[in-house]
UniProtKB/Swiss-Prot annotation:
Any one GO CC term of the record: endoplasmic reticulum
Organism: Scheffersomyces stipitis (strain ATCC 58785 / CBS 6054 / NBRC 10063 / NRRL Y-11545) (Yeast)
Extent of the ARM repeats: 13-55, 74-114, 117-158, 161-199, 204-244
Family: Belongs to the FES1 family.
Record bears the keyword Cytoplasm: yes
Pfam families xrefs: Fes1 (PF08609)
GO terms (BP aspect): cytoplasm protein quality control by the ubiquitin-proteasome system; regulation of translation
The name this protein goes by in its record: Hsp70 nucleotide exchange factor FES1
GO molecular function: adenyl-nucleotide exchange factor activity
Subcellular location: Cytoplasm
Entry keyword set: Cytoplasm, Repeat, Translation regulation
């Protein structure tokens, strides 16, 4: 504040040497001095633009971008609920909304709830999880929207059991399937969602869902010598996690895993040794 006062005095006196020496003041300090809007106000203003039917698509995209930067701050993310802004964000996931705004909405959700138990709890009370699962389950969903949707779901479920319960209730396991989709970016996001599911442990119901979804079969299908190394490593890590939680592998799953491990033997020096050893113990 002293520096700001010195800068103000130098401006009034026209002392160019002092102005040059002091440099430009902190913009946030200037906002406080001259009554600029605080961050909660900026958040409200951004949402107002997004909801304004007269605003251009470009203006709405800019507003969403600014909003996401603001809610990277934990306090601001928690203020989404305090200011009753969750419904406005979730509404942007609707089918009739322009595609870019749906992508922004999913991205904002993922950023807000990531490693944030309060925001996870607040979001889980909305219709957002159901809408995200619907988007992720639709084969016609564009890739960029699918990626952000899976990111949001993963962030919402990680270390938060109620979100997984919501996931099951809305048939979320349908998004983890033996799809012919070979896009490694989508696979990585699907695997991240599985990792989030396992972050809250394993019980009988979850084991049953894993078997019904043929998750192990899906994981093993990724273990190929020509596969994407990042996907292979993530799949191995999940298999290792399943073993850690005492998942009961069937004889068929073990046989297929053995075949998969043979496929990636030549890649062993590029994979995490601990996960590889854990997977090999399952088939030994």
């Amino acid at each position: 504040m002293d520096k700001l006062l010195q800068w103000s005095i130098a401006q009034q006196s026209g002392d160019k040497e002092a102005i040059q020496k002091l440099g430009q003041p902190d913009p946030k300090m200037l906002e406080q001095l001259f009554g600029g809007p605080d961050e909660p106000t900026l958040m409200k203003q951004a949402i107002a633009v997004i909801q304004n039917p007269e605003a251009t698509l470009e203006d709405k995209e800019i507003a969403f971008d600014n909003f996401e930067m603001l809610i990277e701050n934990l306090d601001n993310a928690n203020n989404i609920e305090n200011m009753k802004l969750w419904p406005a964000i979730v509404n942007q996931l609707e089918d009739g909304v322009p595609a870019t705004l749906r992508v922004y909405a999913a991205s904002v959700i993922g950023t807000a709830v990531q490693n944030n138990p309060k925001a996870q709890e607040d979001f889980n009370k909305t219709s957002g999880p159901e809408k995200l699962i619907k988007i992720a389950s639709d084969e016609k969903t564009p890739k960029d929207l699918l990626l952000k949707t899976l990111y949001a779901l993963s962030s919402a479920m990680r270390n938060f059991k109620p979100a997984y319960a919501n996931f099951v209730e809305n048939n979320g396991w349908n998004i983890i399937s033996l799809s012919k989709e070979n896009d490694h970016k989508i696979q990585l996001r699907q695997l991240s969602a599985v990792s989030s599911i396992l972050s809250t442990g394993l019980d009988e119901d979850k084991q049953e869902n894993i078997q019904n979804a043929k998750l192990v079969e899906y994981l093993v299908s990724i273990l190929t010598k020509d596969g994407h190394i990042g996907c292979i490593e993530k799949a191995l890590n999940i298999i290792s996690e399943l073993a850690h939680y005492k998942y009961q592998f069937t004889s068929t799953e073990i046989a297929r895993l053995a075949q998969g491990l043979e496929q990636i033997e030549t890649l062993s020096d590029r994979l995490t040794e601990e996960d590889l050893v854990s997977a090999k113990k399952i088939v030994s």
